[in-house]
């Protein structure tokens, strides 16, 4: 199995504690409100909401209902850290065993947040991930984040 890690960093005008609460603790209710035409349901398949929990997130894309399996790896409220993996569904390419997202929030400019993100792609073989799949995944992730950010700014 190959392991490939990518680092990213961005800022948000939303305060770190507010943003963390929305994406790590209240995501099951915030995401459907931020994207009401896309998100259909969030269902716990296994676990109690803590590390090890697997959620099935159903959404509409191109007129079809699709899903992704999201596994919570770790929650670090004290340091505003959250880690999850995509372990199944349409967001997991056939060449990947899982894709892990580690995020850490801290104070950013003007009362906002600095978000550090590490994405680790665990491939089934030794081949690196497909560049087009990575770009498409990042674009979807960015648009989801911007929708949540806009929702939080409009609903303080």
From Swiss-Prot:
Q: What are the entry keywords?
A: Pathogenesis-related protein, Plant defense
Task: Report if keyword DNA-binding is assigned.
Answer: no
- Segments spanning the bilayer are none
Q: Show the InterPro entries listed in the entry.
A: Bet_v_I/MLP, Bet_v_I_allergen, Plant_def-hormone_signal, START-like_dom_sf
| Family membership noted in the UniProt record | Belongs to the BetVI family.
**Which GO biological process annotations does it have?**
abscisic acid-activated signaling pathway; defense response
User: What is the induction note for this entry?
Assistant: By fungal elicitor.
What's a Pfam family this protein contains?
Bet_v_1
The source's domain of life comes to Eukaryota
**Listed GO CC annotations:** cytoplasm; nucleus
Name used for this protein in its record:
Pathogenesis-related protein 1
Q: Which organism is it from?
A: Phaseolus vulgaris
A single Gene Ontology molecular function, please? Answer: signaling receptor activity
Kindly give the CDD domains that the UniProt entry links to this protein: Bet_v1-like
């Amino acid at each position: 199995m190959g392991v490939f890690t990518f680092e990213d960093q961005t800022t948000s005008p939303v305060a770190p504690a507010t943003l963390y609460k929305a994406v790590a603790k209240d995501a099951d209710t915030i995401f459907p409100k931020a994207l009401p035409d896309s998100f259909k349901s969030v269902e716990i398949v296994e676990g109690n909401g803590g590390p090890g929990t697997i959620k099935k997130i159903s959404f509409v894309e191109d007129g079809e209902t699709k899903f992704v399996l999201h596994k919570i790896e770790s929650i670090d409220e004290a340091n505003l850290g959250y880690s999850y993996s995509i372990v199944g569904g349409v967001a997991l390419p056939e060449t990947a065993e899982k894709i892990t997202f580690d995020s850490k929030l801290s104070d950013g400019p003007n009362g906002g947040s600095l978000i550090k993100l590490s994405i680790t792609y665990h491939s089934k073989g030794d081949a690196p991930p497909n560049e087009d799949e990575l770009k498409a995944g990042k674009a979807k992730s960015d648009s989801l984040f911007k929708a949540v950010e806009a929702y939080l700014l409009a609903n303080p």
